[in-house]
């Protein structure tokens, strides 16, 4: 099985050294991600593409590799191809006929060829010869040069013929690590997840910083989103997850800051803390999900006041986005259902927030704030390797057993998404299996028969462990994790 990964146009116009460096980084990313799926994957970097090969030609492996390639930043498009050597144009025709004869039956088609190397023919001749031959051989097919049903793509490189069997649209953007590191402030809502995704797509290795205002359940939810984003779009590179207990800071603000200034002061405290964390981690910029005018703290005046507490660059990828645009992207990338279950905590501490904060007034209110509280919570920041979030969840749910053999009368709850469940159904014979996607579990688990024992199941055990912790924290004791 072979794939040809095309380069982003913005990479191809770089200087030769930069283009080579970016392509090498992309090759490394592709290799790192795909070898998590198939250890037999090999890659080869060319000037204008990257070749990906594997000896495992099974449909299941192909599907997993295709889905992974679609989510790697820096890939605008990739091709599934059949590669072979050829003798002449007629040989190209015969090889193309063997691959595409069935696909053009009762359809209109055209042939498009790209050629590199020295040959006694040009691309147009290949298109005409192969297209004419297919038209004669497949009687029900008809040539149509504009808007055909099927376009047959051929690529010729010296003596090698690449017959494209399928073209896939990639994520686009830049390869991760071609830009510098950023620290994304995660609340768990739609905005912070989408802004993190935008920076990953742009090639920045994106670390996550969470200010906990809502207890362990809130932290579990944000960890889920952060792990999901990393695992789906950024798994080629290690990143960190920083967890800061911000409840003491909120308490200090509630006690000592005038009500209308609370929202802006809270955001300034978060930026101060994030700046210290970024400096320690040698991270070059902060990322927030703020969108201009969306809430009271996100007016131009207030954002300007918030910015004044740091010299570190603050990136706001969603500044000009409407809320519906953000939700649409969240749905597309898969974070919408996570975010639906996480309440917004930042907005609850100020009843009549100012939309035009005055810097001197804010600084006066902050004069009543005990900054030792902020220093203390920053010094106690918990730092995780994002890859260890699953392991950390396992340690935290020590009261939840991991079950290999299903007890009598126990019910298995498959918490995978409907798509995952459909692709790989969980078949357990006579055992009762309920299907409740992880993003609905928090609202639907309480409706189940509480006299029964429930075993949560997902493919890798990460989501099931995190969900078990969430249910434990909410008082449900009849929960275990099923790990066959």
From Swiss-Prot:
It catalyses: [ThiI sulfur-carrier protein]-S-sulfanyl-L-cysteine + a uridine in tRNA + 2 reduced [2Fe-2S]-[ferredoxin] + ATP + H(+) = [ThiI sulfur-carrier protein]-L-cysteine + a 4-thiouridine in tRNA + 2 oxidized [2Fe-2S]-[ferredoxin] + AMP + diphosphate; [ThiS sulfur-carrier protein]-C-terminal Gly-Gly-AMP + S-sulfanyl-L-cysteinyl-[cysteine desulfurase] + AH2 = [ThiS sulfur-carrier protein]-C-terminal-Gly-aminoethanethioate + L-cysteinyl-[cysteine desulfurase] + A + AMP + 2 H(+). Transmembrane segments: none annotated. Residues 63-167 form the THUMP domain. The active site is at residue 458. One of its GO terms (biological process) is thiamine biosynthetic process. The keyword Transferase applies. It is found in: Cytoplasm. It is an enzyme of class 2 (transferase). Disulfide bonds join 346-458. Residues 406-484 form the Rhodanese domain. Its EC number is 2.8.1.4. ATP binds at residues 185-186, 267, 289, 298. It comes from the Bacteria. Catalyzes the ATP-dependent transfer of a sulfur to tRNA to produce 4-thiouridine in position 8 of tRNAs, which functions as a near-UV photosensor. Also catalyzes the transfer of sulfur to the sulfur carrier protein ThiS, forming ThiS-thiocarboxylate. This is a step in the synthesis of thiazole, in the thiamine biosynthesis pathway. The sulfur is donated as persulfide by IscS. Belongs to the ThiI family. This is tRNA sulfurtransferase. It comes from Colwellia psychrerythraea (strain 34H / ATCC BAA-681). The gene is thiI.
């Amino acid at each position: 099985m072979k794939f040809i990964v095309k380069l982003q146009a913005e990479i191809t116009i770089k200087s030769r050294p930069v283009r080579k460096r970016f392509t090498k980084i992309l090759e490394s990313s592709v290799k790192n991600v795909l070898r998590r799926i198939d250890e037999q994957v090999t890659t080869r970097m060319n000037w204008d593409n990257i070749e990906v090969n594997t000896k495992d030609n099974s449909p299941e492996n192909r599907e997993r590799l295709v889905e992974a390639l679609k989510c790697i930043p820096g890939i605008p498009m990739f091709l599934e191809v059949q590669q072979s050597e050829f003798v002449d144009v007629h040989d190209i025709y015969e090889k193309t006929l063997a691959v595409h004869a069935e696909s053009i039956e009762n359809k209109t088609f055209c042939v498009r060829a790209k050629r590199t190397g020295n040959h006694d023919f040009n691309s147009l001749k290949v298109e005409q010869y192969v297209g004419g031959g297919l038209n004669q051989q497949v009687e029900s097919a008809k040539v149509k040069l504009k808007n055909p049903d099927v376009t047959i793509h051929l690529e010729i490189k010296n003596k090698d013929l690449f017959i494209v069997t399928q073209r896939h649209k990639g994520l686009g953007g830049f390869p991760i690590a071609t830009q510098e590191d950023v620290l994304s402030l995660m609340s768990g809502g739609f905005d912070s997840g989408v802004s993190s995704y935008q920076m990953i797509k742009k090639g920045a290795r994106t670390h996550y910083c969470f200010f906990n205002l809502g207890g362990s359940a809130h932290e579990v939810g944000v960890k889920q989103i952060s792990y999901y984003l990393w695992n789906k779009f950024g798994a080629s590179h290690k990143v960190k997850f920083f967890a800061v207990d911000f409840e003491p800071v909120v308490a200090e603000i509630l006690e000592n800051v005038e009500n209308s200034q609370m929202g802006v002061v809270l955001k300034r405290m978060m930026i101060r803390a994030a700046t210290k964390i970024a400096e320690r981690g040698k991270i070059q910029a902060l990322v927030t999900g703020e969108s201009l005018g969306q809430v009271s703290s996100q007016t131009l005046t207030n954002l300007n006041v918030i910015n004044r507490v740091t010299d570190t660059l603050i990136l706001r990828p969603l500044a000009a986005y409407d809320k519906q645009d953000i939700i649409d992207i969240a749905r597309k990338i898969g974070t919408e259902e996570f975010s639906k279950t996480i309440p917004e905590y930042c907005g609850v501490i100020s009843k009549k927030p100012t939309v035009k904060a005055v810097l001197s007034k804010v600084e006066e209110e902050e004069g009543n704030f005990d900054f030792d509280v902020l220093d203390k919570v920053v010094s106690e920041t918990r730092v995780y390797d994002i890859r260890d979030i699953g392991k950390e969840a396992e340690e935290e749910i020590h009261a939840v057993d991991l079950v290999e053999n299903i007890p009598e009368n126990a019910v298995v709850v498959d918490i995978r998404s409907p798509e995952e469940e459909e692709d790989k159904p969980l078949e357990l014979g006579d055992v009762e299996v309920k299907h409740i996607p992880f993003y609905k579990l928090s609202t639907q688990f309480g409706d189940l028969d509480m006299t029964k024992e429930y075993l949560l199941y997902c493919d890798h055990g990460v989501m099931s462990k995190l969900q078990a912790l969430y249910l434990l924290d909410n008082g449900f004791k009849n929960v275990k994790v099923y790990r066959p």
